[in-house]
Curated annotation (Swiss-Prot):
One of its GO terms (cellular component) is endoplasmic reticulum. The gene is RRBP1. Residues 197-604 are annotated as: 41 X 10 AA approximate tandem repeats of [TN]-Q-[GSA]-[KRQT]-K-[ATGSV]-[ED]-[GTAS]-[ATIS]-[PQTAS]. The lineage of its organism: Eukaryota, Metazoa, Chordata, Craniata, Vertebrata. The modification N6-acetyllysine is found at residue 932. GO terms for molecular function: RNA binding; signaling receptor activity. Acts as a ribosome receptor and mediates interaction between the ribosome and the endoplasmic reticulum membrane. There is a cross-link at residue 148 (Glycyl lysine isopeptide (Lys-Gly) (interchain with G-Cter in SUMO2)). InterPro entries: Rib_rcpt_KP, RRBP1. This is Ribosome-binding protein 1. It comes from Homo sapiens (Human). The modification Phosphoserine is found at residues 159, 165, 533, 573, 583, 615, 900, 959, 978, 1276-1277.
Length: 1410
């Protein structure tokens, strides 16, 4: 029994009420004074009810919050007790990475130059033992001090996600940010250089990327578990690499520099106290940070010019590249920043594993830019030798690399430093979102130092000038970065190179996996990093330079071969992130190929931009640049294939042909080729139309097969239409089912409301009963008092009253119980009915789905049959073509023998033609004679009829006169009075008789003219039937074209609507600020997006997409747009051809209209004349009526005449009106068809434009979905669910757009049907127009008419042939577009599958997190 069921609760409440009422009655009957026990029972009852209600509410809340708790819930490991909470410092960034670290704080000065927009940064509570770092000026004072820190507990931050996988870097200028640095617990005093330095953080555990080796990208490192940042849930992440052990860049930043790196663990700078820490890198011997203090140490790289280490120290070194937004080290913090590049595997910062990674490449997440911020970054790479930053000291060090462009950190200041490399779009580390961080940037593809070495790899960075390996040779050169213990190449000391960073994700280091990681970058060439290669890009000596990384184009080493310094890397580009902005940006840094070297995959490597090292800043590096270009040339593709066509000059060809010997077949073939080239077409080949011509037989067979194919295609179309109808029915039934479900739900809600109302009533009645019980208790008390004081009579009376009240109570309770039971029974019955209806509807829906699947299977079978038929048709065509070739060869052989026969045949044909013309003339003359004889016989008959009518009229007039005389006799008395009037009437009658006779003659003439016109019309109709048939064929061709255009329009509109919806939803999901604009039209919305795009990209919200990815996608979209534009041009040319044909047709129609307008005008003039005469006759008849009112007989006679005249005139006027109406209708139809054609053309152009947009948006959607699949997985924190809901939203949007497209398809089918009906009516009207042409007076000879008709027929045949060709072209284009649409549908299906996989992954994550 379910306690929370409403029915059971109601029963429980009711039962409780009954129990309470029974107790009350019992108390009343026994007159007990146990009021307190009764009240306690009521209180207990209420408490129980409150508990059950509270439990129900709590359970609902728990069910709602389970998912959230499952995502946010994390187990805290607190071996040393809880850490006291402190207010976090405002500028402290947190990088959750390594297990069990105690936090120590090192704060760097934060001079801010330009305004900065910082993404929200999670803060870490500071420990009580933490000490603030001193300024860089105090370095000398605190050089060798070692701060001891008590061990702290791992759970510094339980479930803070420092940066989501899509965190945006929103800096407009670089800025230094104080970092929270945590030394490792129990770190020893002097960690040997080759020992387990902090860089080795998980040396044997395989670098951070391997950290979840099969769980590919580092960001997903423990996919279902808190990301690497949370690397053991709240144990300061390795990114905190000893939570803010100031990165190597800060290496001796204040004092808790890298030396302080593990404050109690002897700073990494002191990393073997005897071996001056890399941070201090032989502090007195100028530390690598100060790498040649007097020589402008690399850190100071031109001290006032912002050394590369400080890379615009106030402007935030490259390390801080994405300052609050998590520097390049944090490059893709979810993807695990470049600093963590192989965090446990010895990050590139640990590049000198014992010697402290190169700046711990983003030690506190300080990116490669900070690569050795105090140590000074890789740019300082040849410090005393004028480090690469100083690459020509006066030429502005690499930090200044483009002085106005501010150091590498500022790589293109406005473009946001390399950290910002993809401006809000995931710093360089995220560059290929955890799939290739900048460390991997081109792991062997020339580390950042080399990034535009100028053409000299970082190892040789100042080749003769102490390469980075020799960086400060006595001071443990950074090249020896692992003092010989692990060269930067071994960056992940054998613990899977940085390249293996996300082993399953193919890290950039593995880019040339067999080419051994960047460290091994030429393993033995430790100092010279690729001494033999010579560029570090040649990463795996035997493997083509990483820049070529399989690109065979050019390695990143030559990244800007002649644009030496990294700052200038793409000086006009600008930022390295934008490294070749026109080409896929470094963020995508080998988007498809994964290597940074492929940075400009389709646009060849940026390094190739100038094959010669032209930079004035690195004159010493020209020779190695040439070597690199040489190595590049080796990998370049060879000469074109030998299979291509060979082009010879004319003279050599003539000489070779003259010297050769041919057989007959070869000579014939040469003749054919030459004749085709010269445009010689031998008409005689095509005149072999005798009965036994095999070509004609084959053509007939081909036509028959084509007819069979057409019938089968029609059957397939019928099956498809049936399928569409069934799909429509399915949609309707689904809508009905949904409506039914909604109704049932509404009913259920109403029932629940009724149940709650019943419960409320029960509670109210319960309260009333309680009140009554209380009243009764009061009465009982009074009665008891009276009993104590009063007599026995009162007691008896009171007992009677008590019994009466008890009976009333029992009755009331029984009535209430019966009512409630009845209501509950009704509600249960209704619920059972509703559930049955739901089950029936669900079964019906399942049956419909089964039917639909069966029909789809049938449709697939039909399509297979059609494909088979098409294949057989192609085979037959090939066989026919072979046969035709054979026949043509035979004709060529027999051509010479038939030369004489041709002349005779031509003469005979001319004679036959002359005979045929004479014969046709004879026939036409005979037909004319016959027609004239018929006309004469008709005229004779008409004359006889006219004479008979005349005699009848005379007899009638005589009878009228006799009647008049009789009337005069009767009115003999009135003769005297009316004699004068009778004389007048007689005179008038005579006049009328004469007029009537004249009218009769005119009527006879009109009848003759009408009959003549009818005869002529019949003749002309017969003649024009043939012309109309030709016009009909032309119209059918036009119809087919229009149908094909409408179909293409429908398909393109479907795609357009679908992709508009998808792109709008995707862009709205990515840029929620555009949600207000989404209500506009799509074109207006795109314009607004273009206008607001730059501002949104400059100032995007925290979870914005990577601008580098978007830029690369835009470039790809531009390329696809260019290809689609070419297709659009083809479509336009074809449409132009069809327009020309339609204009020719229109001109011919207009000419015919003008001819018939003239004829109709003449007919109208005749009609007007006849109308004038009719009006005149009507006037006369009216006069006659007025005069003959006295005599009824005269009236009858005149009315009869009027009726006959009216009949004749009405017939004539009706015919003229019909002709006029038909002509007007034809004009309207022609105008409508023309407007429809223009609309179809405009729509086709729109569709071609919209197809380009659609494909562009599809590519963007694909990339967005792929990025969402890669980057959305690690977001297991509370911020992750919105990212995981995007795929579900996209899926629902796809289904919604598909339903809309089906509706639009049905509407278009209706429109096409209406259009066909309109075309059939136009055909009919044109036929009537032809009849009208015949109606006019054609007095010219019939031979001239026949010649005109022949000319028109020939023109129409030409037009139909041209239209047929255009139709075939359009059909081919339609096929190509259909194939493209099918491909795009496949891509949409793939996207849906990916979305489903992403949903499955998110559900599995929720399960594991719970």
């Amino acid at each position: 029994m379910d306690i929370y069921d409403t029915q059971t609760l109601g029963v429980v409440v009711f039962g409780g009420f009954m129990v309470v009422s029974a107790i009350g009655i019992f108390l009343v009957s026994t007159f007990s004074m146990k009021e307190t026990s009764y009240e306690e029972a009521l209180a207990n009852q209420r408490k129980e009810m409150a508990k059950t209600h509270h439990q129900k509410v709590e359970k609902k809340k728990k069910e709602k919050t389970v998912e959230k708790k499952g995502k946010t819930k994390k187990k805290e490991e607190k071996p040393n007790g809880k850490i006291p909470d402190h207010d976090p410092a405002p500028n402290v960034t947190v990088l959750l990475r390594e297990p069990v670290r105690a936090p120590a704080v090192a704060v760097a000065p934060t001079p801010v130059q330009p305004p900065i927009i910082v993404a929200p940064v999670a803060t870490v509570p500071a420990m009580p033992q933490e000490k603030l770092a001193s300024s860089p000026k105090d370095k000398k004072k605190k050089e060798k001090k070692v701060a001891k820190v008590e061990p702290a507990v791992s759970s510094v931050v339980n479930s803070i996600q420092v940066l989501t996988s899509k965190a945006a870097i929103l800096e407009t200028a670089p800025k230094e940010v104080p970092m929270v640095v945590v030394p490792p617990v129990g770190a020893k005093g002097n960690t040997p250089a080759t020992g387990t330095t902090q860089g080795k953080k998980a040396e044997g555990t395989q670098n951070q990327s391997k950290k979840a080796e099969g769980a590919p990208n580092q960001g997903r490192k423990a996919e279902g578990t808190p990301n690497q940042g949370k690397k053991t849930e709240g144990t300061p992440n390795q990114g905190k690499k000893a939570e803010g052990t100031p990165n190597q860049g800060k290496k001796a930043e204040g004092t808790p520099n890298q030396g302080k790196k593990a404050e109690g663990a002897q700073n990494q700078g002191k990393k073997v106290d005897t071996t001056p820490n890399q941070g201090k890198k032989v502090e007195g011997a100028p530390t690598q940070g100060r790498k040649a203090e007097g020589a402008q140490n690399q850190a100071k790289k031109v001290e006032g010019a912002q050394n590369q280490g400080k890379k615009a120290e106030g402007a935030q070194n490259q390390g801080k590249k994405g300052e609050g937004a998590q520097n390049q080290g944090k490059k893709a913090e979810g993807a695990q920043n470049q600093g963590k590049k192989a965090e446990g595997a010895q990050n590139q910062g640990k590049k000198a594993e014992g010697a402290q990674n190169q700046g711990k490449k983003a030690e506190g997440a300080q990116n490669q830019g900070k690569k050795a911020e105090g140590a000074q970054n890789q740019g300082k790479k040849a410090e005393g030798a004028q480090n690469q930053g100083k690459k020509v000291e006066g030429a502005q060090n690499q930090g200044k690399k483009a002085e106005g462009a501010q150091n590498q950190g500022k790589k293109a200041e406005g473009a946001q430093n390399q950290g910002k490399k993809a401006e809000g779009a995931q710093n360089q580390g995220k560059k290929a979102e955890g799939a290739q961080n900048q460390g991997k940037k081109a792991e062997g593809a020339q580390n950042q130092g080399k990034k535009a070495e100028g053409a000299q790899n970082q190892g040789k960075k100042a080749e003769g000038a102490q390469n980075q390996g020799k960086k400060v040779e006595g001071a443990q050169n950074q090249g020896k970065k692992a003092e010989g213990a692990q060269n930067q190449g071994k960056k992940a000391e054998g613990a899977q190179n940085q390249g293996k960073k996300a082993e399953g994700a193919q890290n950039q280091g593995q880019k040339g996996e067999g080419a051994q990681n960047q460290g091994k970058k030429t393993e033995g060439a430790q100092g010279k990093k690729a001494e033999r290669s010579p560029n570090q890009g040649k990463k795996g000596e035997g493997a083509p330079i990483q820049g070529k990384k399989a690109d065979s184009v050019a390695n990143q080493g030559t990244k800007v071969e002649g644009i030496t310094n990294q700052g200038k890397k793409a000086e006009g580009s600008p930022s390295e992130g934008k490294k070749a902005e026109g080409s896929p940006n470094q963020g995508k840094k080998a988007d498809a190929a994964a290597n940074q070297g492929k940075k400009t995959e389709s646009a060849s490597v940026q390094g190739r931009n100038t094959d010669v090292a032209q930079s004035p800043e690195a004159p010493k590096q020209e020779a190695p640049a040439k070597k690199k270009s040489g190595s590049k040339k080796k990998g370049e593709p060879g000469p074109p294939d030998a299979d291509g066509p060979l082009y010879l000059p004319y003279k050599t060809l003539v000489s070779t042909v003259g010297s050769m010997v041919f057989n007959e077949g070869e000579a014939q073939r040469l003749i054919e080729i030459l004749s085709e080239k010269a445009g010689i077409i031998q008409d005689t080949w095509h005149k072999a139309t005798q009965k036994g011509d095999p070509v004609a037989i084959l053509k007939r067979q081909l036509e028959e097969k084509e007819k069979l194919l057409a019938t089968e295609q029609e059957d397939a179309a019928v099956a498809k239409s049936k399928l569409r109808e069934l799909n429509k029915e399915m949609a309707a039934e689904k809508a009905k089912a949904a409506a039914g479900e909604a109704k049932v739900k509404k009913q259920l809600v109403a029932r629940e409301q009724e149940i709650t109302a019943v419960q409320a009533r029960m509670q109210a009645s319960y309260r009333e009963h309680v009140k009554e019980v209380q009243q009764l208790q009061g009465k009982i008390r009074t009665l008891q008092e009276q009993l104590e004081n009063g007599p026995n009579t009162q007691l008896a009376r009171l007992q009677q009253e008590n019994s009466i009240l008890r009976d009333a109570l029992n009755q009331a309770t029984s009535q209430v119980e019966s009512k409630q039971n009845a209501e509950l029974a009704k509600l249960r019955q209704e619920l059972s009915k509703v559930s049955k209806e739901l089950v029936e509807k669900s079964e019906a829906v399942r049956q419909d789905e089964q039917q639909r699947k069966a029909l789809e299977a049938k449709a697939a079978a039909f399509e297979k049959q059609v494909l088979q038929l098409q294949a057989s048709h192609r085979e037959s065509e090939e066989a026919l073509q072979k046969r035709l070739d054979e026949v043509s060869r035979e004709l060529c052989h027999t051509q010479s023998s038939h030369a004489s026969l041709r002349a005779d045949a031509e003469k005979a044909q001319e004679q036959q033609q002359q005979m045929a013309e004479l014969h046709s003339k004879l026939q036409s003359s005979e037909a004319e004679v016959r027609s004239k004889c018929e006309e004469l016989s008709g005229l004779h008959g008409q004359l006889q009829e006219a004479r008979a009518e005349n005699s009848q009229l005379t007899e009638r007039i005589r009878s009228i006169e006799a009647l008049l005389e009789a009337g005069q006799a009767r009115d003999a008395q009135d003769v005297q009075a009316s004699q004068a009037e009778a004389d007048q009437q007689q005179t008038r009658l005579k006049e009328l008789e004469s007029q009537v006779s004249g009218l009769e003659k005119e009527a006879i003439e009109l009848r003759e003219a009408v009959e003549q016109q009818k005869v002529k019309n019949n003749d002309l109709r017969e003649k024009n039937w043939k012309a109309m048939e030709a016009l009909a064929t032309a119209e059918q061709a036009c119809k087919e074209k229009l149908l094909s255009l409408t179909q293409a329009k429908e398909e393109s509109e479907k795609q357009l609507c679908l992709i508009e919806a998808q792109t709008m939803e995707a862009l709205l999901a990515l840029l929620p600020e555009l949600s207000v604009l989404a209500q506009q039209n799509y074109t207006e919305w795109l314009q607004d997006l273009k206008e607001k795009g730059p501002t949104l990209l400059k100032h995007p919200p925290a979870p914005a997409e990577p601008s580098s990815d978007l830029a690369s996608k835009l470039r790809e979209a531009e390329e696809t747009q260019s290809t689609l534009q070419a297709e659009c041009d083809q479509y336009r040319s074809i449409l132009a051809e069809t327009e020309g044909m339609l204009r020719d047709l229109q001109k011919s129609v207009e000419e015919e209209e003008q001819v018939w307008r003239a004829k109709v005008g003449a007919a109208e003039e005749e009609l007007q004349k006849s109308r004038v005469t009719v009006k005149h006759l009507e006037e006369i008849v009216e006069k006659l009526k007025g005069e003959l009112e006295s005599s009824d007989q005269v009236r009858e006679h005149t009315s009869h005449l009027e009726a006959e005249l009216e009949k004749h005139m009405a017939a004539a006027s009706a015919e003229c009106q019909n002709y006029a109406k038909e002509v007007a209708g034809l004009r309207q139809l022609l105008l409508e068809s023309q407007s429809q054609l223009d609309a179809a053309k405009s729509e086709a152009q729109k569709q071609s434009d919209e197809l380009a947009l659609v494909r562009q948006q599809l590519s963007e959607m694909k990339s967005h979905v792929e990025d969402g699949d890669i980057a959305g997985a690690p977001a297991s924190s509370p911020e992750a669910p919105p990212a995981e809901q995007d795929p579900v939203q996209l899926k629902t949007q796809l289904e919604w757009t598909e339903a809309i497209l089906e509706d639009e398809q049905t509407q278009r089918q209706k429109l096409t049907a209406e259009f066909e009906e309109a075309q059939t009516s136009a055909c009919r009207l044109q036929e009537e127009l032809e009849k009208l042409r015949t109606a006019g007076p054609l007095e010219s000879s019939e031979t001239e008419e026949a010649s005109q008709l022949k000319e028109r027929l020939e023109k129409e045949k030409k037009l139909t042939s041209d239209l047929g060709r255009a139709a075939t072209r359009l059909q081919e284009l339609l096929k190509t577009t259909q194939e493209q649409l099918a491909r795009e549908k496949d891509t949409v299906k793939k996207l849906q599958e990916q979305l489903e996989k992403a949903e499955d992954g998110s559900s599995s994550k929720e399960g594991t997190s719970v």
